[in-house]
A protein has these predicted regions:
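Transmembrane helical cores of multi-pass ion-transport proteins
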Residues: 1-433
Length: 433
C-alpha cells in the first residue's frame, strides 16, 4: 500500500449526481452538529470561540481533501481540551501555535515512517484511563459557567484548583444562569432519548437537527426575551468578530519551542490515536479500509494549516464521522462541504454566535464529557481484568485529572512495560521449573 494515497482520488471515480446529493445532505447536517460543538470545545480549551470554528473549517477541509478515509470528519475534539488549556496558560497562544505546528510535523513524519499501524497498539487501559480523565476534567471546568459563578480573578487551569475555587465562590451562584443551564441540559437529554425511541418519518427531524442546536436556539430566545439573564459569549468575548481565518506566523523563541516539545508530542500522539480509531469505526460502517499512513500525513498537514490560520489542534471526531455516515456521506466531498459551510457561518453569522448563553455551552460540554467518559469500559476493566491492568487504568485516569495528559500517558506506558516484563520473567521461571 502506498504511503500517501488520498481517498478522494479513488472516491471520485464513478461519482455522480446521486452521490453528490447524499454528500451535500450529510455535509450540511454534520456542519450543523459541528457549529455549536466547535465553539464549545474552543471555550473549554481556553481559546476564543472563533478559533474552534477556524479549526473545523481549515483543518476539516485539508484533512478531508488529503486524508486516507472516505468519511472521517475532523475538527476540534474534547480530547484536546485539557492539554490546549495547559499550553495556553503556560506559553500563551503563541506557544499553542508552535506546539500545533510541531505536532503537525511529527504526524507527517509518523505517516512517512509507516507508523499508522503501530499507533493502534496503544493499550486499551491507557486510552480508557486518559479519555475518562479528560471527561472528568471537562465536567469540572464547566461547573463555573453552568452555575454562573464569579471567581474574582483568572480561572485556574488545573482541575483541583478549579474545584477549590468553585467551593470558595459557591455563594456567588446565579440562579438565573442555573435555570438556563438546566433548561439546556434537559433539552439535550430529552432530544437524545427521543432520537433513540422515535421511529418513522418523525425520526428524520432528530437525525437532521442535533439537540445542541435546539438548546442554543432556546437559550438565546430565553435570554433575549425573558427576565432570565446570564453571561453570553458576546459579554465574555466582546472583541469577537467574524470573517475568514487570517494567515499568521508565530514568533519562534527558543525557550518557547523547548517548553512546548512535550505538549507537541502529546498532541500528535493523541491526534493519531483518536483519528485512526475514528477511521476504524467508520470502516466497519461503510465496509471500507482506510490508509492509516495517508491519514496521519493529512492530519499533520491539517494541524499545520490550523495553526497558521488561528486554529487549535484537530483530529478525527468519532461522533461527527458517525453522523456523516448515517446521513449518507460516502466520500470526502461531504467533509469538504461541512468545512465550507462552517467557513460561511464564520463570515455571516458570528453576531448570532455572540448571543449564545454560557450556561448552554456548559450544558453541551457536560453531555460531551458524559459521552466520551467510557464509564462502561472503565467499570468493565475494573471488574474483569488483572490487577496490573486496573493499576494502569486508575493511574492514567488520576494523573490526567491531577497533573496532565503528557505525564498520564508516559506513566501508563511505563507501568504497562513494567508489568509486561514481570509477566515475562515469571513465564521464564515457570518454564525452567
Amino acid at each position: 500500500m502506498k504511503i500517501f494515497q488520498p481517498k478522494i482520488i479513488s472516491s471520485l471515480k464513478g461519482y455522480n449526481g446521486h452521490k453528490l446529493l447524499s454528500d451535500v445532505i450529510a455535509g450540511v447536517i454534520v456542519a450543523i452538529i459541528a457549529l455549536p460543538l466547535s465553539i464549545a470545545l474552543a471555550i473549554a480549551s481556553g481559546a476564543e470561540p472563533a478559533q474552534g470554528l477556524f479549526t473545523a473549517a481549515v483543518a476539516g477541509l485539508v484533512i478531508a481533501a488529503l486524508g486516507g478515509s472516505r468519511v472521517n470528519i475532523s475538527g476540534p475534539t474534547a480530547a484536546f481540551a485539557t492539554i490546549v488549556a495547559g499550553v495556553i496558560a503556560s506559553s500563551g497562544m503563541n506557544g499553542l501555535v508552535i506546539a500545533t505546528l510541531m505536532a503537525g510535523v511529527i504526524l507527517i513524519i509518523l505517516g512517512l515512517c509507516r507508523a499508522g499501524s503501530l499507533i493502534r497498539f496503544m493499550p486499551h487501559t491507557i486510552t480508557v484511563g486518559f479519555t475518562s480523565g479528560i471527561a472528568v476534567t471537562i465536567l469540572i471546568g464547566q461547573i463555573k459557567d453552568f452555575l454562573g459563578l464569579d471567581f474574582h480573578g483568572a480561572t485556574p487551569v488545573e482541575a483541583g484548583e478549579k474545584l477549590i475555587e468553585i467551593v470558595k465562590n459557591f455563594a456567588t451562584l446565579q440562579w438565573k444562569a442555573l435555570v438556563i443551564g438546566l433548561i439546556g441540559l434537559a433539552i439535550l437529554i430529552a432530544w437524545t432519548i427521543l432520537a433513540s425511541k422515535i421511529k418513522g418519518k418523525a425520526s428524520m427531524l432528530f437525525k437532521m437537527v442535533p439537540g445542541s442546536i435546539i438548546a442554543v436556539i432556546v437559550g438565546i430566545l430565553v435570554v433575549q426575551f425573558t427576565p432570565l439573564k446570564c453571561a453570553t459569549i458576546g459579554s465574555l468575548y466582546p472583541t469577537l468578530t467574524g470573517g475568514f481565518p487570517k494567515f499568521s506566523l508565530p514568533e519562534f523563541k527558543l525557550d518557547t519551542v523547548i517548553a512546548v516539545i512535550p505538549d507537541a508530542f502529546a498532541i500528535a500522539i493523541l491526534a493519531a490515536i483518536e483519528s485512526l480509531l475514528s477511521c476504524v469505526v467508520s470502516d466497519k460502517m461503510i465496509d471500507d479500509k482506510h490508509n492509516s499512513n495517508t491519514e496521519l500525513i493529512a492530519l499533520g498537514a491539517g494541524n499545520i494549516c490550523s495553526g497558521l490560520f488561528g486554529g487549535i489542534p484537530a483530529t478525527g471526531a468519532i461522533a461527527r464521522t458517525a453522523a456523516n455516515v448515517k446521513n449518507g456521506g460516502r466520500t470526502p466531498i461531504a467533509g469538504i462541504l461541512h468545512a465550507i459551510i462552517i467557513l460561511l457561518f464564520l463570515v455571516v453569522m458570528m453576531p448570532v454566535a455572540k448571543l449564545i448563553p454560557m450556561p448552554i455551552i456548559a450544558a453541551i460540554l457536560f453531555l460531551v464529557a458524559y459521552n466520551m467518559s467510557e464509564w462502561k469500559s472503565f467499570l468493565g476493566i475494573c471488574k474483569t481484568r488483572k490487577v496490573g491492568d486496573i493499576i494502569v487504568l486508575v493511574t492514567t485516569f488520576l494523573l490526567t485529572i491531577i497533573l496532565n495528559l503528557v505525564v498520564a500517558i508516559i506513566a501508563g506506558i511505563v507501568i504497562t512495560l513494567i508489568f509486561f516484563l514481570i509477566h515475562k520473567i515469571k513465564e521464564k521461571k515457570a518454564a525452567k521449573n
